[in-house]
Amino acid sequence: MATYYKDRFKHAANISKDGFSISKVECKELDIIGIYRSQDGNVQDLIKELKDLIDSRKTTVIGGDMNICVLRKPNNYVTSSLKEMGFQQIVSKATHIDGGIIDHIYIAQGENVKLAWNLEYFPKYYSDHDGLGLTTWLVE
């Protein structure tokens, strides 16, 4: 997994376990966590690592290829665990060539700032996944 970010962000963590990788960048207003989870990646271990990274007081965006379809399994362990922590899953259209939503984006509004967002889908001829483009801005 590669993470690209602007100068106002700083790299906070990289975690690589058997079956998943996590990268976190942060700035004063926002934490962003990127994930790749293979089909065999342990979801309990993934959530445990995320709980250690998430600051519940801070607005946080989590996104990545979870390899779990929220259309087929809307109450899967990852989605239900993140919902319990105050996250909302915002991807609503298929992101995979087979028609599933296996690429997720979760947002939790913290005490510090509130975000508004726009999500765009970018079909790619060279991949079985659509690209997702998330634009965010602060709401006053």
Feature locations, PLM:
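A basic- and aromatic-enriched beta-loop-alpha substructure that forms the phosphate/nucleotide-
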Residues: 1-3
